[in-house]
Amino acid sequence: MSFENAVIGATASSLANIAVYPLDLAKTLVQTQLKDEFVEAGEEAGEERAGSRRQNRIKPIALRSPQAAEQYKGALDALQRIYGAEGVAGLYRGLGSSTVAGFIQSFSYFFWYTLVRKHYFRLKQARGGDARFSTPEELVLGIVAAATSQLFVNPINVVATRQQTRGQAAGAADMRTVAREVHAENGWRGFWAGLKVSLVLTVNPSITYATYERLREALFPTPAAASHLVDSAALLSPGQNFVMGVLSKIVSTVLTQPLIIAKASLQRSGSCFQDFHQVLHHLYSTEGPLSLWKGLGPQITKGVLVQGLLFMFKGELTKMLRKLMFYLALLRSSRRALKG
């Protein structure tokens, strides 16, 4: 059952991410760009800039490549300029590695989440206590599953983010080429850039799924045994799953947006940030506290669409799989009857 849930969850997640990939690309570019006033490239990086009103407060951040300083007014501007310069293909640069990373991460997450949740549920039943999970329990179960999956997928996430943020000047590159660039610049350690903040961000899907379960129990209550032994998404209609997914993702995104920005900034092409504390400090010092939530609009739009589609696809794929298994069982039974 854990393997089936993992395959269904990963497939649903991949389909949802492919559907909104251009928006994901745009929000990554918007989130990782720095203001011109605080960006320099080449040997002048780190020196005070003449005429800058803040030259005594902050030093510019060095970037390894000129395209890393490209500025966009917003997600729509990014999409229009990428399409104008690179065509439709430009809107899907990095799609392959991003889809692979998403599938592996989702598969691992759903596998461990289902497995841990099922065994913990049985343990609670054996002790004779309330079989329902509390919100803290849902969060802990989700964090354990997400942290485990992140260990496997971080290197692919680094490659995917670099492909997204290379820019037209650097040219398109496949996964192998980008992986070689990462290794040449930072060795094997480069593939684990942003791992710490990624582990901290494991609270994001945990908040999402805990919120989903709480909303489902409040708005669409079901018997305790059914809701914990059966995939919750399969108990609701596609529309209900979509609404629950959207609401739960809004909550988790608003709470974790600063960490999402820090992770993307660490993994982007041309970044010289060393850790997520440096990213957050730089953004707060140079652009103010609201910069920690920049790109929140496209992040929420992308996130809620993906989460809504994910729960909808997951619920429908689960129902399809069960129907298929039922028909196969009937077919086997009829064959035995004919042989008998």
UniProtKB/Swiss-Prot annotation:
Keywords in alphabetical order, please.
Answer: Hydrogen ion transport, Ion transport, Membrane, Peroxisome, Repeat, Transmembrane, Transmembrane helix, Transport
Which residue spans adopt a coiled-coil conformation according to this UniProt entry? Answer: none
Listed transmembrane segments? 6-26, 96-116, 139-159, 190-210, 242-262, 293-313
Question: Matching Gene3D superfamilies, A to Z?
Answer: Mitochondrial carrier domain
Note the SUPFAM superfamilies from the entry.
Answer: Mitochondrial carrier
Q: Where does the record say this protein resides?
A: Peroxisome membrane
Q: Which GO terms describe its biological process?
A: ADP transport; ATP transport; fatty acid beta-oxidation; peroxisome organization; proton transmembrane transport
List the molecular function annotations (GO) for this entry: ADP transmembrane transporter activity; ATP transmembrane transporter activity
UniProt xrefs under InterPro entries = Mitochondrial_sb/sol_carrier, Mt_carrier_dom_sf, Peroxisomal_Ade_carrier
Keyword Hydrolase attached: no
Superkingdom per UniProt: Eukaryota
Q: Spell out the residue ranges that the record assigns to Solcar repeats.
A: 4-119, 133-218, 236-320
**Do the record's keywords include S-adenosyl-L-methionine?**
no
Its placement in the membrane is given as: Multi-pass membrane protein
Record's Gene Ontology CC terms?
peroxisomal membrane
- One Pfam match, given by its short name, reads Mito_carr
Q: Which family does the record claim for this protein?
A: Belongs to the mitochondrial carrier (TC 2.A.29) family.
Job description of the protein: Adenine nucleotide transporter involved in the uniport of ATP and adenine nucleotide hetero-exchange transport between the cytosol and the peroxisomal lumen. This transport is accompanied by a proton transport from the peroxisomal lumen to the cytosol. Transport of ATP into the peroxisome is required for beta-oxidation of medium-chain fatty acids.
Question: Can you name this protein?
Answer: Peroxisomal adenine nucleotide transporter 1
Protein species of origin: Eremothecium gossypii (strain ATCC 10895 / CBS 109.51 / FGSC 9923 / NRRL Y-1056)
